């Protein structure tokens, strides 16, 4: 048993022994299925807080010949798999967190040298009787062990892409690193599985990728590994039952990463913190400050500002992911920034529609923090004033509401403002603070038509009135309230009982004036 060659299972044991551990050992069934095949190269990229290192430690505990992990895995899903015992602790396993190596190195070249020396030292301790052709060359040493001992290798590289975050501009050193990994891993009989984790997909340079033998599983397309990206809906429901938390609130705050086959993924670190502390809140910024997001927002490529504001308002925006360079420094268009934000977890990607959105309220709060501290001062003012606008609706002060919407329109005047959708967008920003008290639905189906915006009080704020908003464009503002009643919008609130505020808003293009009317009604034994 060494430090990097055939380590013990202690790191995975820590995860299993924690207050909350969600069984993700089903991943091993997939890795077992590709052992010693052309599909043995796996690169998994996902954001921080999404359990990459835990998965790497799990693979280490399962494959490492330095472990006796049968009992450790016996109560988990993988133990039911027919191949469970066949591969359990049967491989020479090299497991390295590249960030740890980088932190003790002063350059990428030193990282490569240190990695080689550390692995070679463990190899020579484990196999002192091997006739090493060149005991300074890690590739030669691994080949010698394989040929003389008939022991194949599983190589697990956690945070493999750290150098692209630390050395963003050093292209020559990046290529050297990629070439080194290729030389160690590609077309080598001694490799039966290579598993790498990172935040970014594999870096491309020139006309090819040095690591083009890898299958990539990312936040854009996790493929068959989607359920292992984070916590699934079923897993979170079980935790909510165990810890007596409201699944609706948890879903609103931490869900939002959706993949094929309708797999919905929650942010695991945030869910765990929420359960442990029994409190809905923003746990994202405890591991990732909004400064990281602010850097990219302040780039403000043409169209980026519009996209960010639209997403804060709850919309989706189209994105072309095809030109992204898979690094954190090469940006030519807004799409490059948005694609990076997909990989960082700041937006979720819909593979079918090719659009992105802010996944949940926790992440949305980070956008508001970033915008408030950015150079977009005029926009942040509208967001900060949104609490006053909401209060004005509660107090039925339509003139103040109309003035606030006018101000929000002025501050986002670069947005094409020519239909009800644009008006809805502006009002969503003007009422951003409502997200603290309401579940917001846009174009909620109901009655004979649909309402533009419906605000349903969250369970913990039952004293707040529901709000139904009808948006008009060059129409009679009083007719908006009548239309709400005529179309029976409030039938959409069938399970709601209590006060409801009917809000009509109209924008007159000729006078450029916003008008607002507010009426109160009650949903009880009779429906509005």
Descriptions of predicted regions:
Residues 427, 451-455, 464-473, 487:
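Conserved catalytic cores of phosphodiester-cleaving nucleases, focusing on short active-site segments
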Residues 379, 462, 504, 511-515, ...:
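Acidic, low-complexity intrinsically disordered tails
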Residues 59-63, 178-182, 453-456, 484-490:
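Short, well-ordered amphipathic alpha-helices
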Residues 1-417, 434-437:
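Phosphate-binding site recognition
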Residues 154, 465-469, 501:
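Structural motif
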Residues 477-481, 488-518:
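Nucleic-acid nuclease catalytic cores
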């Amino acid at each position: 048993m060494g430090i990097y060659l055939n380590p013990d299972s202690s790191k995975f044991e820590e995860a299993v022994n924690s207050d909350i551990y969600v069984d993700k050992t089903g991943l091993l069934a997939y890795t077992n299925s590709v052992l010693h095949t052309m599909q043995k190269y796996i690169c998994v990229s996902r954001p921080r807080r999404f359990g990459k290192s835990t998965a790497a430690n799990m693979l280490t505990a399962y494959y490492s010949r330095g472990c006796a992990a049968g009992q450790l895995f016996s109560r988990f899903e993988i133990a039911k798999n027919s191949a469970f015992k066949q591969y359990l602790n049967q491989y020479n396993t090299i497991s390295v967190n590249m960030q740890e190596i980088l932190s003790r190195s002063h350059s990428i070249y030193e990282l490569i040298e240190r990695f080689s020396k550390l692995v070679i030292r463990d190899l020579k301790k484990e196999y002192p009787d091997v006739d090493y052709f060149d005991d300074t060359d890690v590739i030669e040493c691994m080949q010698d062990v394989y040929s003389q001992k008939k022991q194949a290798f599983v190589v697990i590289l956690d945070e493999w892409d750290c150098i692209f975050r630390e050395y963003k501009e050093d292209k020559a050193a990046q290529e050297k690193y990629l070439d080194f990994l290729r030389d160690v891993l590609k077309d080598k009989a001694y490799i039966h599985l290579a598993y790498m984790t990172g935040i970014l997909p594999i870096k491309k340079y020139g006309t090819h990728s040095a690591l083009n033998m890898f299958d990539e599983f990312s936040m854009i397309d996790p493929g068959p590994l989607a359920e292992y990206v984070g916590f699934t809906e079923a897993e979170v429901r079980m935790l909510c039952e165990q810890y007596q938390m409201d699944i609706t609130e948890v879903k609103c705050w931490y869900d939002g990463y959706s993949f094929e086959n309708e797999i919905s993924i929650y942010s695991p670190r945030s869910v765990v913190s929420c359960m442990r502390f029994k409190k809905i809140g923003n746990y994202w910024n405890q591991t990732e400050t909004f400064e990281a997001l602010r850097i990219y927002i302040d780039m403000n490529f043409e169209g980026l500002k519009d996209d960010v504001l639209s997403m804060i308002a709850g919309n989706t925006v189209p994105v072309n992911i095809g030109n992204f360079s898979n690094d954190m420094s090469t940006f030519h268009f807004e799409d490059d920034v948005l694609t990076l934000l997909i990989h960082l977890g700041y937006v979720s990607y819909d593979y079918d529609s090719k659009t992105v959105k802010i996944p949940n309220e926790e992440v949305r709060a980070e956008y508001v923090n970033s915008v408030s501290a950015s150079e977009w001062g005029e926009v942040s003012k509208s967001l900060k004033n949104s609490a006053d606008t909401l209060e004005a609706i509660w107090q039925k002060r339509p003139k103040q509401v109309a003035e606030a919407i006018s101000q929000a329109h002025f501050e986002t005047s670069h947005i094409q403002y020519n239909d009800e959708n644009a008006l809805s967008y502006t009002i969503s920003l003007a009422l951003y603070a409502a997200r603290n008290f309401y579940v917001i639905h846009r174009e909620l189906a109901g009655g004979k038509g649909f309402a533009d915006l419906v605000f349903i009080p969250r369970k913990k704020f039952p004293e707040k009135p529901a709000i139904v908003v009808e948006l008009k464009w060059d129409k009679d503002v009083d007719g908006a309230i009548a239309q709400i009643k005529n179309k029976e919008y409030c039938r959409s609130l069938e399970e709601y009982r209590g006060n409801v505020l009917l809000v009509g808003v109209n924008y007159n293009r000729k006078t450029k004036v916003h008008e607002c009317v507010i009426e109160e009604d009650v949903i009880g034994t009779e429906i509005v």
